[in-house]
């Protein structure tokens, strides 16, 4: 990684365990590795920001169980990890809808963020879901937007769009 990018990530909330690997280099690694659930789990468990983002990129979303997804979401402590997790794993998993509702109800900032990102993903990717199905969540967004943690608040903007 690069020190400049590492400093940038850390100033935005990434913890000390961050190398500062660029998204372009992570994408190159993803292409080189392909899907590798065993490596993804090892990288995720290392608790390194860059490793968790890459883990989300190389995980097999269809193989992940609901308990595994719940375990991973509770490990998230940086918004870019949450975004990578939802876009690469959660949005392509059969449990997306059920987890979305559970995570939106969470008090944990990054869990809630992932819930709203999952909702935005479902709304954009699945035209068979009637708009009315998101009504309760949209009312919740309107009600709690002012008091929601910052990353959850940002994710609600994606869900609202």
Positions of predicted regions on the chain:
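Alpha-helical scaffold domains
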Residues: 1-161
